Amino acid sequence: MLVLSRRAGESVVLGEDVVVTILEVRGDVVRVGIDAPRSVRVHRAELLAQLEETNRQAASPSEDVIANLARALDHGTGTDPSS
C-alpha cells in the first residue's frame, strides 16, 4: 500500500483521469473530493461490503422459504396459470 501525506487543497492523480483532492481536514475527519469519469465506479468501502453481504443473503434463500416451496411443489399448489 502506498501511503501519502497530503494537506487540504492538495491532490493525488490516479492513472490518467482520476484526481483525488483533500478538501478539508477537521480533527479525525477528512473530506475528499474525487474527480473521475462516469465509467469509473467510486464507492465507500464500508457501503460496498454491506452491499455485497446483502446480495449474498438475497442469493441464499432461508430454509423456511425452501421448505415452503418444497411443500407447495409436493401438493401441486404452485402458481401455474393453466390449472
Curated annotation (Swiss-Prot):
SUPFAM superfamilies: CsrA-like (SSF117130). One of its GO terms (biological process) is regulation of bacterial-type flagellum assembly. Pfam families: CsrA. One of its GO terms (cellular component) is cytosol. Keywords: Bacterial flagellum biogenesis, Cytoplasm, Repressor, RNA-binding, Translation regulation. It comes from the Bacteria. Its main location: cytoplasm. It is found in: Cytoplasm. GO terms for molecular function: mRNA 5'-UTR binding. Homodimer; the beta-strands of each monomer intercalate to form a hydrophobic core, while the alpha-helices form wings that extend away from the core. A translational regulator that binds mRNA to regulate translation initiation and/or mRNA stability. Usually binds in the 5'-UTR at or near the Shine-Dalgarno sequence preventing ribosome-binding, thus repressing translation. Its main target seems to be the major flagellin gene, while its function is anatagonized by FliW. Belongs to the CsrA/RsmA family. This is Translational regulator CsrA. The lineage of its organism: Bacteria, Bacillati, Actinomycetota, Actinomycetes, Propionibacteriales.
